[in-house]
């Protein structure tokens, strides 16, 4: 399949390159040029008044929690989890996770998200939803190491990895998913690390999300979560660490030296009053930071444009520094950094020879005028509804705001029905 995107503006680094033509051959960006003279074009997309940029990457979410959107709001994390969310999650079925995942994927594709990282359960059903939709994902079975048989818990994660890692021509990747230090003691984590090394897998976990978590771990082990993880050897494998809100300067050095990828979830952290991660210091020390929404029950959406704008504004206010997290850095966090953290190679930028993972944003709208700085407009003015076209591995998932791979009406109906059936269950 050879697709030509004509007369499109392209985001390359921190600049908009105007009026180019992008030739996509199968799943690769074959050529970017001024010419339209190509042999055998199967499909043409009009790029006029649009910006092509890398697809957005949600580095941390719990997709099937779309079913709990709006169910429990305005509560602290511990109460929200223990009294509201966990009792409902205990009722979930595999079908619930499948339809909840599809609902989230519809929302993400509509907003220009082309890849995400998720930790949950019934992950075979989520993987099926990913396979059907055409989106990319790094998936992890959430593992709790303090309840039941530790070996059985670990084996579920390992079995899932064997079945799905690099499936769908590499669109689906798998990490092992020990939930957090407060649910996974060092003895269990050591087993997870050994398996990750044996299978050449990364690890996805939650770290230092709240002040209470940090204090509890210090009381239990005499170390902060990040120092504890460093001691047990977690950072000897590629790690995606979600949150990292309460970290000190020495811990930031550890994250940098060990190459830990951090999923910054600014909106969820604010909504749950968890705090604000020291992103400025992380970036200064070379920590690779991506952006995430967290679950749609704690955000309450999967809109990466909101996270992009928030990361570029929140830290300016917190640091009292107007140049902290400039527009260019916010976009890199949401694209290139995210793909690298998830382990997808040759993606995250628009370049010849790279994967055709890109979106087209319609900038022929009042909030993009006057066009003094379109890079700035993408961060401070754009929204999900501006995304016109989504292409993943050279496959069109959405064009002119129409989803091509999913039955959106059916998915919304099924998800709504299941969400309210869950609430009715005793």
Curated annotation (Swiss-Prot):
<feature type="binding site">
    <location>
        <position position="89"/>
    </location>
    <ligand>
        <name>substrate</name>
    </ligand>
</feature>
<feature type="binding site">
    <location>
        <position position="294"/>
    </location>
    <ligand>
        <name>substrate</name>
    </ligand>
</feature>
<feature type="binding site">
    <location>
        <position position="62"/>
    </location>
    <ligand>
        <name>Zn(2+)</name>
    </ligand>
</feature>
<dbReference type="GO" id="GO:0050270">
    <property type="term" value="F:S-adenosylhomocysteine deaminase activity"/>
</dbReference>
<dbReference type="InterPro" id="IPR023512">
    <property type="entry name" value="Deaminase_MtaD/DadD"/>
</dbReference>
<feature type="binding site">
    <location>
        <position position="206"/>
    </location>
    <ligand>
        <name>Zn(2+)</name>
    </ligand>
</feature>
<dbReference type="InterPro" id="IPR011059">
    <property type="entry name" value="Metal-dep_hydrolase_composite"/>
</dbReference>
<feature type="binding site">
    <location>
        <position position="179"/>
    </location>
    <ligand>
        <name>substrate</name>
    </ligand>
</feature>
<keyword id="KW-0479">Metal-binding</keyword>
<dbReference type="GO" id="GO:0046872">
    <property type="term" value="F:metal ion binding"/>
</dbReference>
<dbReference type="GO" id="GO:0090614">
    <property type="term" value="F:5'-methylthioadenosine deaminase activity"/>
</dbReference>
<dbReference type="InterPro" id="IPR050287">
    <property type="entry name" value="MTA/SAH_deaminase"/>
</dbReference>
<dbReference type="InterPro" id="IPR006680">
    <property type="entry name" value="Amidohydro-rel"/>
</dbReference>
<dbReference type="Pfam" id="PF01979">
    <property type="entry name" value="Amidohydro_1"/>
</dbReference>
<dbReference type="InterPro" id="IPR032466">
    <property type="entry name" value="Metal_Hydrolase"/>
</dbReference>
<comment type="function">
    <text>Catalyzes the deamination of 5-methylthioadenosine and S-adenosyl-L-homocysteine into 5-methylthioinosine and S-inosyl-L-homocysteine, respectively. Is also able to deaminate adenosine.</text>
</comment>
<keyword id="KW-0378">Hydrolase</keyword>
<keyword id="KW-0862">Zinc</keyword>
<feature type="binding site">
    <location>
        <position position="294"/>
    </location>
    <ligand>
        <name>Zn(2+)</name>
    </ligand>
</feature>
<feature type="binding site">
    <location>
        <position position="209"/>
    </location>
    <ligand>
        <name>substrate</name>
    </ligand>
</feature>
<comment type="similarity">
    <text>Belongs to the metallo-dependent hydrolases superfamily. MTA/SAH deaminase family.</text>
</comment>
<protein>
    <recommendedName>
        <fullName>5-methylthioadenosine/S-adenosylhomocysteine deaminase</fullName>
        <ecNumber>3.5.4.28</ecNumber>
        <ecNumber>3.5.4.31</ecNumber>
    </recommendedName>
</protein>
<feature type="binding site">
    <location>
        <position position="60"/>
    </location>
    <ligand>
        <name>Zn(2+)</name>
    </ligand>
</feature>
């Amino acid at each position: 399949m050879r697709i030509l995107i004509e007369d499109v503006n392209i985001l390359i680094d921190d600049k908009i390159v105007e009026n180019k033509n992008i030739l996509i051959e199968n799943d690769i960006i074959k050529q970017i040029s001024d010419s339209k003279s190509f042999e055998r074009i199967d499909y043409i997309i009009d790029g006029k008044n649009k910006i092509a940029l890398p697809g957005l990457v949600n580095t941390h979410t719990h997709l099937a929690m779309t079913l709990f959107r709006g169910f429990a709001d305005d509560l602290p994390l511990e109460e929200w989890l223990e009294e509201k969310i966990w009792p409902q999650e205990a009722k979930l079925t595999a079908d619930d996770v499948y339809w909840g995942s599809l609902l989230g994927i519809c929302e993400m594709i509509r907003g220009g998200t082309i890849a995400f990282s998720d930790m949950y359960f019934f992950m075979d059903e989520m993987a099926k939803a990913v396979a059907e939709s055409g989106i990319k994902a790094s998936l992890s079975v959430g593992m709790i190491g303090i309840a039941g048989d530790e070996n059985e818990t670990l084996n579920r994660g390992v079995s899932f990895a064997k079945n799905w890692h690099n499936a769908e021509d590499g669109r689906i990747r798998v990490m092992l998913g020990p939930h957090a230090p407060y649910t996974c003691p060092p003895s269990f984590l050591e087993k997870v690390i050994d398996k990750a090394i044996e299978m050449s897998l990364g690890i996805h976990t939650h770290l230092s999300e709240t002040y209470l978590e940090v204090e509890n771990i210090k009381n239990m082990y005499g170390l902060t979560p990040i120092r504890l993880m460093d001691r047990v050897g977690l950072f000897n494998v590629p790690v995606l660490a979600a949150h990292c809100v309460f970290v000190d300067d020495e811990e930031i050095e550890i994250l940098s030296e060990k190459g830990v990828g951090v999923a910054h979830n600014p909106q969820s952290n604010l909504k749950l009053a968890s705090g604000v991660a020291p992103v400025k210091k992380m970036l200064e020390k070379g920590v690779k930071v991506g952006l995430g929404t967290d679950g749609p029950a704690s955000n309450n959406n999967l809109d990466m444009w909101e996270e992009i704008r928030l990361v570029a504004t929140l830290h300016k206010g917190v640091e009292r520094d107007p140049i902290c997290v400039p527009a260019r850095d916010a976009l890199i966090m949401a694209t290139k950094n995210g793909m690298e953290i998830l382990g997808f190679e040759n993606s995250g930028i628009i370049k010849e020879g790279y994967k055709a993972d890109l979106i087209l944003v319609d900038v022929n709208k009042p909030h993009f005028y006057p066009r003094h700085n379109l890079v700035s407009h993408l961060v401070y003015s754009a929204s999900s509804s501006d995304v016109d076209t989504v292409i993943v591995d050279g496959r069109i998932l959405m064009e002119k705001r129409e989803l091509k791979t999913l039955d959106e009406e059916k998915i919304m109906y099924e998800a709504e029905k299941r969400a309210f059936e869950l609430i009715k269950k005793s």
